[in-house]
Amino acid sequence: MNDQQPFSVTASPTTEKTSAFSLTIRPDNIGVISIDVPGERVNTLKSEFAEQILSVFELARQHATLRGLIFISAKPDSFIAGADITMLNKCSSAEQAENLAKQGQETFDQIAALPFPVVAAIHGACLGGGLELALACDYRVCSLDEKTVLGLPEVQLGLLPGSGGTQRLPRLIGLDSALDLILTGRHLRAGQALRQGLVDEAVPHDILLDTAVEILKKGKRKAVPLGWRSRLLNSPGIRHLLFKMVKRKTRAKTHGNYPATEKIIQVVRRGIEKGREEGYRHEARAFGKLVMTPESAALRHLFFATNALKKTSGAASEAKPIHRVGILGGGLMGGGIASVTATRGQLPVRIKDINEQGINHALKYNWQLLTKRVQSKRMKPTERQRLMTLISGSTDYRGFEHADIVIEAVFEDLALKRQMITEIEDHAAPHTIFASNTSSLPIHQIAEGARRPQLVVGLHYFSPVDKMPLVEVIPHAHTSAETVATTVALARKQGKTAIVVGDSAGFYVNRILAPYINEAAYCLLEGEPIESIDYALVRFGFPVGPLALLDEVGIDVATKIVPVLSEELGDRFTSPPAFDAILKDGRKGRKNGKGFYRYNKTRRFWHSGKEVDSSVYPLLDVTPKAHIDPALISQRAVMMMLNEAARCLDEGVIQCARDGDIGAVFGIGFPPFLGGPFHYMDRLGMETVVKTLLVLQQQYGDRFAPCERLLTMREGQRTFYPPADKDNSIS
């Protein structure tokens, strides 16, 4: 064999097309392993790949003068996005899942044990098992491309890194930094990864391979003495304090609802204190146990559900291209919509407001958001400037003739929204879609009188727009399928998860939220303290309690939705009459510093910035005293939400249980570890759900009467998802 000529061999003993790994030996005797999973858009690791990787190593060893190996992806924007999660659904026991982890550990140990240097040349997503593979290499170099991210997100699936990640990462970047990355599952961009020591170099994509070659020439990585910081953290006393602090902080955030976080801390500690081999054993065992937990099953269900949703347009039509976007209103919502359109969608945005102040507000808001990214080194100042040039404004309709879609974000006033349609039909192109960002007004009423009703659609964003991931797309009876598909496509370009919902009062998210908040209000009127109610629901798994949420949304905004809901859907949506006193007292929530809580403008490190406003109690004529079991508080509020979600499915407000689960989790923070209302009801069982509602109905009234859908499902012993392989059946 001529060592000076490049040649290619494949990892598979069959054909190149069946192998995800192929080996090319360069003239300089450096081997390049290309990763390219056949027929897949991104690279993911599968159990059968262990044999393929080992075959590559065997072929490499046959080349006597080989200087080293470089792993690189043949996919455009994906190094390795993680393991193929469907493998876990095939595991019927913890032992089977544990064996998968052991296989990964053994395979990556083979990489670390190779007698020559190995480099991971990373471009695109390097996540989960992909990063664990890279950690087993001697060196890591990544591209500076914005699509390059590194992380161990397994905790977001209720798992821990099972192929050595819990053992290798702390030894590479330090115990505290590793715990932070593994426990949060957050992603690092190239610059962050370089600063943390996760990669050795971060370079432009076009010199990635050349840089990997130069690094490889250094030879096998030699052991480097620990720095003073690592030595300090590894001292028994400091280490004990660190683990104690991390455990306390983690439990305060998770309230014990996520078993993976406890296991992560235990496994990392075991490896640090008892050695790597012992750490591996505990890592694999913990991984196997976590795979079988209901929490992981629920989180994997959401993973599959969101992936399935991305593959649908929401309508039986193709989306038309969107080149320019118009926005009516430069307030908080309008400014937020402009931000995600320009920053994530990379689309030119034209804002119209009745005065310059509104436009200036939107521009200032976007500048502040981008400046935060510049200050955190996630964006260069030149990129901030470029994105700001995409946003312009005017007090008239100049430029709107070029808009393909106009998003209205004005006050919740029916006459005003109808006027906006008329003006857009006068000034915009005949093909321009009119999307109303309304939280309560029926779209068919807004579209009444429109000359082109087929182009009118609802597009409900949640506040704050730059942070909340969900949007509801609401067609009315005359909205065209193309309009729906195009609106969904725009929402996805903006980085949103979009569900298509029916045009009825409250749509889906606000409709299931209202009875949940109402029940919290009834608990308050029974004398339960505000903080007790909120804490009960936070412990259950919601990010904030219902009364704190009311303050955040705005008490005035929330109460405007109530008449719309109660008029169309009945008395169960009527808020307690005593609550009128809260509005009359001028309480709007955080926006005016006065709601169920008092908000201090100046925060101190010993103070959260808000405290219960006890002057609420006399307004409601109650004396606060904690007397309701927290489990009963959460049961009452959550059961109201579950019952309403089932009604929404029965009435066609949502198209399927999958959309209902996604809407609740991403729209209002329904506990992800429960998988959404429908997944949770399946887990409880229809018998338990109906029985609980009947008991609550007997105690608290007919608002708890189980809906017809639940009664029918109990009768037929049915579930919302197919019992077999439920986590992968989300249609």
Curated annotation (Swiss-Prot):
<comment type="similarity">
    <text>In the central section; belongs to the 3-hydroxyacyl-CoA dehydrogenase family.</text>
</comment>
<dbReference type="InterPro" id="IPR036291">
    <property type="entry name" value="NAD(P)-bd_dom_sf"/>
</dbReference>
<dbReference type="InterPro" id="IPR006176">
    <property type="entry name" value="3-OHacyl-CoA_DH_NAD-bd"/>
</dbReference>
<keyword id="KW-0520">NAD</keyword>
<feature type="site" description="Important for catalytic activity">
    <location>
        <position position="132"/>
    </location>
</feature>
<keyword id="KW-0560">Oxidoreductase</keyword>
<dbReference type="Pfam" id="PF02737">
    <property type="entry name" value="3HCDH_N"/>
</dbReference>
<dbReference type="InterPro" id="IPR012802">
    <property type="entry name" value="FadJ"/>
</dbReference>
<feature type="region of interest" description="3-hydroxyacyl-CoA dehydrogenase">
    <location>
        <begin position="320"/>
        <end position="729"/>
    </location>
</feature>
<dbReference type="GO" id="GO:0016509">
    <property type="term" value="F:long-chain-3-hydroxyacyl-CoA dehydrogenase activity"/>
</dbReference>
<dbReference type="GO" id="GO:0004300">
    <property type="term" value="F:enoyl-CoA hydratase activity"/>
</dbReference>
<dbReference type="Pfam" id="PF00378">
    <property type="entry name" value="ECH_1"/>
</dbReference>
<dbReference type="InterPro" id="IPR029045">
    <property type="entry name" value="ClpP/crotonase-like_dom_sf"/>
</dbReference>
<dbReference type="GO" id="GO:0008692">
    <property type="term" value="F:3-hydroxybutyryl-CoA epimerase activity"/>
</dbReference>
<keyword id="KW-0456">Lyase</keyword>
<keyword id="KW-0442">Lipid degradation</keyword>
<protein>
    <recommendedName>
        <fullName>Fatty acid oxidation complex subunit alpha</fullName>
        <ecNumber>4.2.1.17</ecNumber>
        <ecNumber>5.1.2.3</ecNumber>
        <ecNumber>1.1.1.35</ecNumber>
    </recommendedName>
</protein>
<keyword id="KW-0963">Cytoplasm</keyword>
<comment type="similarity">
    <text>In the N-terminal section; belongs to the enoyl-CoA hydratase/isomerase family.</text>
</comment>
<keyword id="KW-0443">Lipid metabolism</keyword>
<dbReference type="Pfam" id="PF00725">
    <property type="entry name" value="3HCDH"/>
</dbReference>
<keyword id="KW-0413">Isomerase</keyword>
<dbReference type="InterPro" id="IPR001753">
    <property type="entry name" value="Enoyl-CoA_hydra/iso"/>
</dbReference>
<keyword id="KW-0511">Multifunctional enzyme</keyword>
<dbReference type="GO" id="GO:0070403">
    <property type="term" value="F:NAD+ binding"/>
</dbReference>
<dbReference type="InterPro" id="IPR050136">
    <property type="entry name" value="FA_oxidation_alpha_subunit"/>
</dbReference>
<keyword id="KW-0276">Fatty acid metabolism</keyword>
<dbReference type="InterPro" id="IPR006180">
    <property type="entry name" value="3-OHacyl-CoA_DH_CS"/>
</dbReference>
<comment type="function">
    <text>Catalyzes the formation of a hydroxyacyl-CoA by addition of water on enoyl-CoA. Also exhibits 3-hydroxyacyl-CoA epimerase and 3-hydroxyacyl-CoA dehydrogenase activities.</text>
</comment>
<dbReference type="GO" id="GO:0006635">
    <property type="term" value="P:fatty acid beta-oxidation"/>
</dbReference>
<feature type="site" description="Important for catalytic activity">
    <location>
        <position position="154"/>
    </location>
</feature>
<dbReference type="InterPro" id="IPR006108">
    <property type="entry name" value="3HC_DH_C"/>
</dbReference>
<feature type="region of interest" description="Enoyl-CoA hydratase">
    <location>
        <begin position="15"/>
        <end position="204"/>
    </location>
</feature>
<dbReference type="GO" id="GO:0005737">
    <property type="term" value="C:cytoplasm"/>
</dbReference>
<dbReference type="InterPro" id="IPR008927">
    <property type="entry name" value="6-PGluconate_DH-like_C_sf"/>
</dbReference>
<comment type="pathway">
    <text>Lipid metabolism; fatty acid beta-oxidation.</text>
</comment>
<comment type="subunit">
    <text>Heterotetramer of two alpha chains (FadJ) and two beta chains (FadI).</text>
</comment>
<dbReference type="InterPro" id="IPR018376">
    <property type="entry name" value="Enoyl-CoA_hyd/isom_CS"/>
</dbReference>
